[in-house]
Amino acid sequence: MSRKARDPIVLPQGVEVSIQNDEISVKGPKGSLTQVLAKEVEIAVKGNEVFVTPAAHVVDRPGRIQGLYWALIANMVKGVHTGFEKRLEMIGVGFRAAVQGSLLDLSIGVSHPTKMPIPTGLEVSVEKNTLISIKGINKQLVGEFAACVRAKRPPEPYKGKGIRYENEYVRRKAGKAAKTGKK
């Protein structure tokens, strides 16, 4: 059984949870999110706490599905209350980014600028031309878009050039060793 899922999810001030049919909806100051529930899990709202329990008919490792939905609902609550943010930094000569309407324009050392459509529900801003900030209430959407941006030019191990998460450690490799001795 998931140890975290044994504890209830405490709802902060201003966050409401409602369950209708097989869908859970979380509303807060930053917006609202919905999630379809599996039949293997039961959700109960008591006061300002949400309890996640496996359904009675689940016999094969009920903690897995309980832990999954506990984490999904906890992320929804955090998202509508405080939101999520991923920051990416671009390292390289001539690397820069700009937001143009609903497009993220990346100059990453290729012959043409790379334009990426920004998904709805995300707020993307660029600071100092090389620092990209991605904010939103949906943790999965924020992380997925940040991973797509990083995948356009992942950091290479020799000089460290590329797009990386802020404070990401890139393991560096030694370059070619120079030849020594006479020919």
From Swiss-Prot:
Listed GO CC annotations: cytosolic large ribosomal subunit
Keywords of the record: Ribonucleoprotein, Ribosomal protein, RNA-binding, rRNA-binding
Position of the signal peptide: none
Keyword check for RNA-binding: yes
GO molecular function, one term: rRNA binding
Example of a GO biological process term: cytoplasmic translation
A UniProt-annotated Pfam family: Ribosomal_L6
Superkingdom assignment: Bacteria
UniProt keyword annotation of RNA-binding present: yes
HAMAP family linked: Ribosomal_uL6_B (MF_01365_B)
Record's function text: This protein binds to the 23S rRNA, and is important in its secondary structure. It is located near the subunit interface in the base of the L7/L12 stalk, and near the tRNA binding site of the peptidyltransferase center.
Family assignment from sequence similarity: Belongs to the universal ribosomal protein uL6 family.
Subunit structure: Part of the 50S ribosomal subunit.
Protein name (Swiss-Prot/TrEMBL): Large ribosomal subunit protein uL6
Species in which this protein is naturally found: Chlamydia trachomatis serovar D (strain ATCC VR-885 / DSM 19411 / UW-3/Cx)
Gene: rplF
